[in-house]
Amino acid sequence: MQQRRPVRRALLSVSDKAGIVEFAQALSARGVELLSTGGTARLLADKGLPVTEVSDYTGFPEMMDGRVKTLHPKVHGGILGRRGQDDGIMQQHGIAPIDMVVVNLYPFAQTVAREGCSLEDAVENIDIGGPTMVRSAAKNHKDVAIVVKSSDYDAIINEMDANEGSLTLVTRFDLAIKAFEHTAAYDSMIANYFGSMVPAYHGESKEAAGRFPRTLNLNFIKKQDMRYGENSHQQAAFYIEENVKEASVATATQLQGKALSYNNIADTDAALECVKEFNEPACVIVKHANPCGVAVSNSILDAYDRAYKTDPTSAFGGIIAFNRELDAETAQAIISRQFVEVIIAPSASEEALKITAAKQNVRVLTCGQWDTRVAGLDFKRVNGGLLVQDRDLGMVTAGELRVVSKRQPTEQELRDALFCWKVAKFVKSNAIVYAKDNMTIGIGAGQMSRVYSAKIAGIKAGDEGLEVKGSAMASDAFFPFRDGIDAAAAVGITCVIQPGGSIRDDEVIAAADEHGIAMIFTDMRHFRH
């Protein structure tokens, strides 16, 4: 499988010029003839490198403002020509073999992401010659090396040095795979961009057009293979988006512990996204994708202590997320108190890592700090299809709330209501959250009946000896009947926050008034399935 091919002639044409001068210098120093186009050629010439413009090489000028540069038989014949099979026809037409193509494409994604980008701007940043050369070289990888990533430059030079100026078939094949991935992702971006414009071109309303293209092309990069999936009989892998712009489990760095499992990643994502909702030092403990304890306080140590007290039984083997650096004192409290699968935080102190290292199986991840939440898409696979929606980044503020009961909430009740409303957003529907003094005291998750979620939240609080009287209750969706309010009143809830919107809202509000409960409408639902 060695099948080495010497690199004697290379064509370089890049939009992202990072590292290209050094790479070209290294190639030239090893006797490689350099061909290039436009700005790349000028850059290399300015650095004193012996470079031949493609227009001089082909005898055909660049034209149409650079739209036509490399689309010429002398270029593509040199790339596609099969060594040992097409040599005669190449010689007949004066076509020299090109052994390496170094290309990256016009910055289409960056262009369309710019505010005020016009259709004309987008069109002019659709690369034609680049993808054509990339695909030609990748197709003929038995003889030609195609380089689309600057991160490969050093490894290529090292291999050439180790193989007397040649590259192996294994390397050329690997580079070809990267090339096809590169062009597939590029074409997908273009298809998605123009696909989302189709309704507007057909004169349909903006509402009908929405933001979704008529075909959806997704590109993810495999980060790791896994021992198994959600269950041991399922195979699995973890794929991530390229250029993720927000701190996430996908971009987190694992500092210690065993490899993350499928369920670890899903639960860590749930914990991290929940803790992001809070500005104060916060701790979220998750089990099976549901928060089982959440608290905010003046320190993450106290926040952890209070979150743990919500449900110590469920916290065993859970995932713990913080929105502040993991410090030694908090790490010690966790390790001394419970078995934990994963701890994730923006950062971790050296002292904290020394403590967690005593438990080798504990996975510690750092994800960096987050300043803003980035809008994007959520996906849910169904048999034969894919549901797509915007990420649920919605969250009401105190000024947007509507008090619909006779009694107004106290300042403390209002704070508790907003706190448990943030938590309810991340609890599986039907979701009920009891909270008091910035701490969950009972969580009812995933029940088919909302009233049973309310009952479970009360049972959990009672089992842990937590005082419900005077607490706030959040419901992720409206109460269809008054029974949920009656159940809340029976355990001492004094404030309820919910979306509203039921045909029986009047009946539900009347129940709150009967019990002296302050009721707040958010006019925003947070179903989570």
Curated annotation (Swiss-Prot):
Gene3D superfamilies: 3.40.140.20, Methylglyoxal synthase-like domain
Gene Ontology CC annotations of this record: cytosol
GO BP term, pick one: 'de novo' IMP biosynthetic process
Enzyme nomenclature, EC number: 2.1.2.3, 3.5.4.10
Record keywords: Hydrolase, Multifunctional enzyme, Purine biosynthesis, Transferase
HAMAP family, A to Z: PurH
PANTHER family on file: BIFUNCTIONAL PURINE BIOSYNTHESIS PROTEIN ATIC, BIFUNCTIONAL PURINE BIOSYNTHESIS PROTEIN PURH
Domains (record comment): The IMP cyclohydrolase activity resides in the N-terminal region.
Name of the protein: Bifunctional purine biosynthesis protein PurH
Gene field: purH
